[in-house]
């Protein structure tokens, strides 16, 4: 849309579904200063009013005597259109919806620095029209002076004898056909070609040899291009970088992202780098999901996740699990429900960092119209917000009807098998778990037999210890100690997996299958896998 040249070739593949009759339009709302020369077009470009979300027409005067309304925050609506004839048309849309031509001069003044594929990265390092180097030097007469000096070279005298003879034969042939003759070689120009394209920046290597910057590594070329653009005193420069991590080490990616955020001009960046996402703490993230939906992610709701686990936003499908227990529990189930390795399928189970944070993160995904999964406890808080998220996510969000994962599993274990929960993965009674139970009972004897004998309700005691409940603690110090009890049970990823293992081993799965299986099938469907009737387990 902001190409500095009118020379742009389209093909059928540039159109949606290769349907050229449908044409295409790319439109943007841009704030432009007077230095962009937007007001010097053949037809005056009237500004729109920016209302905080979109460009709207300015307030219409009440009568003919009123002054023309001046927008408090003027913006312009620019667009590029691909016609059914495979032609490109640059236009500016007026507030009354009239469309006028957008000149190449204005587009060149705006100045786009584009870093795409490696084959295009040297454009801004050469003296072609509209390049970063061209805008930096801003010497309009340079090409003419270079052309004049080149034209002074007598090309005819530098030809070999065979070449001179071939040229004479051609001249004679043209003369016989009454065509222009008396041929000689000289400097000519052609549409799309410029003598400036042969001129570029050179830099000394370690050996002191001047080498074209275009021949250096991809990362070095990109960094050099951005430095050239930054040296240009332009108020409207727009930087577009595809895969910012290309050719750069992680520390340089981090440095580049931080640098772009401090620039007064705007940058658009695509990335598959967790380092880049984590470093963009001042940027606005937009996410493209597996269904090709693109949506904005509110910074205030994703900031913690962006910093701690940026790979959340790079997965084919991310499942936001409330905490470590849920991560381990869900991972165990998905390992058995999904065909193939989870990571190979692009499936990532992420830590939502608590119930409120998980809700906020899922709300951000829903607001962006994006596809994510979720697995959370039901703490009885914000039921309306959870209901709204559930209505949008459907079966991809699993939330217990009541309580936590530990509560729901332990509640269904047979009375005669409750002591099996006290055992560790080796099948032995875990002394630390016994200690948590004895502490809550206020007894010194940590034997399982004594604990069972003294506990008025063993199930409730295990649930309290496994969840780190502080209820009933005699003092504040005891509250702190009791709160940590959950770590001795299932408050970890390994503990979540252990809990899932015991769910199957102790016969709890059949009772929970109607609740959990729809969630697992929703994840399978998101990955393009067919529905299953049960989960394989030992």
Model-inferred region functions:
Residues 1-70:
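Conserved P-loop NTP-binding catalytic core
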Residues 1-4, 194-195, 201-312, 328, ...:
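Switch/communication elements of ASCE P-loop NTPase nucleotide-binding domains
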Residues 17-22, 69-71, 105-108, 230-234, ...:
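Conserved catalytic network of the ASCE P-loop NTPase/AAA+ motor domain
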Residues 39-148:
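Electropositive, glycine-dotted interaction segments
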Residues 313-318, 327-538:
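Acidic, Mg2+-coordinating catalytic modules of nucleic-acid enzymes
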């Amino acid at each position: 849309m902001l190409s500095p040249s009118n020379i742009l070739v389209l093909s059928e593949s540039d159109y949606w579904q290769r349907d050229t009759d449908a044409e295409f339009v790319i439109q943007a709302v841009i704030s432009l200063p007077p230095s962009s020369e937007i007001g010097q077009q053949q037809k005056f470009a009237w500004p729109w009013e920016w209302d905080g979300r979109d460009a709207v027409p300015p307030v219409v005067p009440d009568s003919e005597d009123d002054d023309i309304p001046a927008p408090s925050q003027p913006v312009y609506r620019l667009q590029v259109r691909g016609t059914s004839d495979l032609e490109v048309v640059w236009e500016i849309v007026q507030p009354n919806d009239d469309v006028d031509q957008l000149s190449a001069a204005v587009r060149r003044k705006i100045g786009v620095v584009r870093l795409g594929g490696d084959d295009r990265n040297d454009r801004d390092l050469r003296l072609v029209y509209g390049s970063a180097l061209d805008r930096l030097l801003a010497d309009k007469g340079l090409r003419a002076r270079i052309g004049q000096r080149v034209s002074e070279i007598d090309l005819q005298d530098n030809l070999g004898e065979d070449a001179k003879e071939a040229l004479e034969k051609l001249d004679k042939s043209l003369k016989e056909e009454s065509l222009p003759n008396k041929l000689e070689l000289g400097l000519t120009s052609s549409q799309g070609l410029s003598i400036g394209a042969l001129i570029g920046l050179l830099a000394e290597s370690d050996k002191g040899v001047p080498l074209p910057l275009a021949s250096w590594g991809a990362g070095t070329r990109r960094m050099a291009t951005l430095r050239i653009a930054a040296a240009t005193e332009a108020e409207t420069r727009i930087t577009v970088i595809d895969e910012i991590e290309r050719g750069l080490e992680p520390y340089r990616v981090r440095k580049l992202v931080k640098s772009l955020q401090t620039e007064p001009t705007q940058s658009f960046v695509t990335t598959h780098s967790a380092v880049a996402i984590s470093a963009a703490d001042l940027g606005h993230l937009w996410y493209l999901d597996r269904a090709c939906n693109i949506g904005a992610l509110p910074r205030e709701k994703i900031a913690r996740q962006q910093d701690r686990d940026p790979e959340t936003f790079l997965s084919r499908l991310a499942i936001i699990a409330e905490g470590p227990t849920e991560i381990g529990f869900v991972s165990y189930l998905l390992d058995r429900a999904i065909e193939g390795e989870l990571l190979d399928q692009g499936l990532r189970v992420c830590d939502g960092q608590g119930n409120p944070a998980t809700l906020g993160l899922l709300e951000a995904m829903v607001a962006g119209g994006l596809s994510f999964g979720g697995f959370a406890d039901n703490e009885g808080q914000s039921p309306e917000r959870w209901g709204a998220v559930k209505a949008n996510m459907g079966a991809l969000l699993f939330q217990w009807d009541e309580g936590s994962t530990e509560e729901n599993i332990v509640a269904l274990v047979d009375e005669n098998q409750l002591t099996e929960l006290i055992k560790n993965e080796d099948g032995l009674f875990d002394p630390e778990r016994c200690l948590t139970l004895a502490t809550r009972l206020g007894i010194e004897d940590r034997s399982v037999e004594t604990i069972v004998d003294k506990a008025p309700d063993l199930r409730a005691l295990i649930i309290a210890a496994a969840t780190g409940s502080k209820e009933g603690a005699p003092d504040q110090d005891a509250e702190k100690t009791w709160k940590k009890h959950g770590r001795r049970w299932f408050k970890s990823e390994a503990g979540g997996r252990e809990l899932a293992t015991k769910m199957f081993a102790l016969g709890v799965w059949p009772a929970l299958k109607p609740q959990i299986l729809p969630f697992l099938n929703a994840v399978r469907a998101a990955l393009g896998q067919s529905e299953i009737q049960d989960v394989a387990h030992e």
